[in-house]
Amino acid sequence: MLDTLLAEAREDENVIGVVVHGSRGRGLHLHEGSDWDVVVVVRKRTGRYDSAERGGELEASEVTSLADLPRWMLPAFTWTTPVLDKTGAVAAELAEITRVDPATAAEPLDDYVNSYYRSAKNARVGLGLAALLDAQESIPHYLDFLFAAHGRMRPYNKWLEWELREHPLPVDVDLDRLERIALTRNLDDQLALFRETEGVARKLGHGATIDAWEPDLAFLRGH
């Protein structure tokens, strides 16, 4: 089915390029029923390539710009290359929409510290469930910060291990520790994670976000 669409797209002057995204785009986590998720970049929308319904073997949609895609969808396009790019513009736009400004890492860093702080405070007064939920909520904020601080978009959870293995960050990410935090809200693990995160934050120019947590920094550092 993809071959048929590509043959049409190559002959169609309205088409600029075609991108296969998701699991097919990476060749990862595929199974017998895996569908093809396709975006066709066109000069003008006509609906010619839009799938009539969801759930088929191939689901295609037309856009005039990849920048029009919803933000939640963008991790599906990281580490993919166009299967058709008549002008080179599609590859350039792919690189642009999956790039993250490291300056934006301050917000998820602050969110991470807030969740860790709440977890530690709740644990101290015996609110076990609240402490666990806050610990779990801290993890996506931590990952958002870590990837954004290095100019990258956090992957979907299903691709996290693959991405760290195939495209590692320049800092270690202890996934076993993250799993322990999510399952047990262990404060020793949370403290170790905060100390590491503070070091990364200061090294990459986000020390002001950490300093804004005074006078609670001593508590956050386990003192």
Task: Please identify what each model-predicted range represents.
Residues 96-223:
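Conserved nucleotidyltransferase catalytic core and NTase-mimicking acidic/glycine-rich helix/loop elements
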Residues 48-125, 222:
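Conserved NTP/Mg2+-binding pocket subregion across the NTase superfamily
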Residues 1-13, 21-34, 39-77:
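Metal-dependent nucleotidyltransferase catalytic core
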Residues 40-43, 80-81, 161, 169-170:
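Short, surface-exposed linear patches
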Residues 4, 10-13, 86, 104, ...:
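Short linear motifs in intrinsically disordered/low-complexity regions
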Residues 5, 62, 93, 178-183:
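Generic hydrophobic, helix-prone segments enriched in Leu/Val/Ile
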Residues 37, 73, 80, 160-163, ...:
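Short linear interaction motif-like sites in intrinsically disordered regions of transcription factors
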